[in-house]
């Protein structure tokens, strides 16, 4: 399952799906081993993007902006040489709604300062104090977007994004009610796109994967930093990085 978070900027864009897929996490759910893996894909990975018979080299996150979810999925499939069965895409407003609907989540701010993005994006004023904190949707959005203060930069941000997803999954599973699940999905339906059927029968089938979601392993696809002739910063991923 490919999870994509679409960066809609300040939220002032007329199209709530206009933007780059700045969050891309590949989720593999294995009911036999009862384990799930989450692998973050760096948005700046330099890769081939093929559309309408033409191939260009560009950043991985631009595939969505060029051709929507279909092209983003195809590009990642080509890069990793895998088949992606399903996708779930959520925009920034949807993340806020989702966290609020499950009653907030508990995260651990590892820094000795408040996490915020107000300096770069004044419209987002939420802050997260150091240590273990119960946060709402607005705070979860800031927590999963901040990168300039993080010594690990975008890798640190992706680590926090995986933490937020893991905490949402844990909170949803703790509800243990089909009606609760349906209510959560309905609350974010305008700000979520997916090719997973979400009717009652399908939700019951998805509950068969519940045990596999109790153990989640987290990974990060890392390449080598590079600045190319165009002045842009990229991640160069080789077969060595992919095999690792």
Residue ranges and their predicted role:
Residues 1-244:
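Non-catalytic, solvent-exposed segments at the cell envelope interface
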């Amino acid at each position: 399952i490919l999870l994509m978070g679409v960066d809609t900027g300040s939220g002032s864009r007329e199209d709530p799906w206009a933007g780059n897929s700045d969050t891309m996490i590949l989720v593999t759910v294995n009911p036999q081993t009862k384990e799930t893996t989450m692998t973050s894909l760096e948005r700046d990975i330099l890769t081939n993007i093929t559309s309408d018979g033409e191939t260009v080299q560009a950043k991985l996150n631009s595939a969505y902006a060029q051709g929507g979810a279909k092209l983003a999925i195809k590009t990642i499939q080509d890069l990793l040489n895998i088949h992606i069965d399903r996708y779930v895409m959520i925009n920034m407003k949807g993340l806020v709604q989702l966290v609020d609907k499950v009653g907030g989540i508990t995260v651990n701010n590892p820094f000795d300062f408040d996490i915020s993005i107000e300096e770069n994006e004044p419209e987002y004023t939420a802050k997260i104090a150091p240590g273990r904190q119960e946060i709402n949707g607005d705070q979860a959005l800031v927590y999963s977007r901040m990168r300039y203060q993080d010594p690990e930069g975008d890798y640190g941000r992706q680590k926090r994004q995986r933490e937020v997803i893991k905490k949402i999954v844990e909170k949803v599973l703790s509800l243990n009610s089909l009606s609760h699940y349906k209510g959560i999905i309905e609350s974010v339906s305008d700000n979520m796109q997916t090719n997973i059927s979400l009717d009652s029968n399908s939700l019951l089938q998805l509950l068969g994967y519940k045990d596999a979601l109790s153990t989640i392993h987290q990974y990060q696809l890392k390449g080598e930093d590079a600045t190319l002739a165009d002045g842009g910063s990229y991640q160069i991923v080789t077969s060595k990085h992919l095999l690792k």
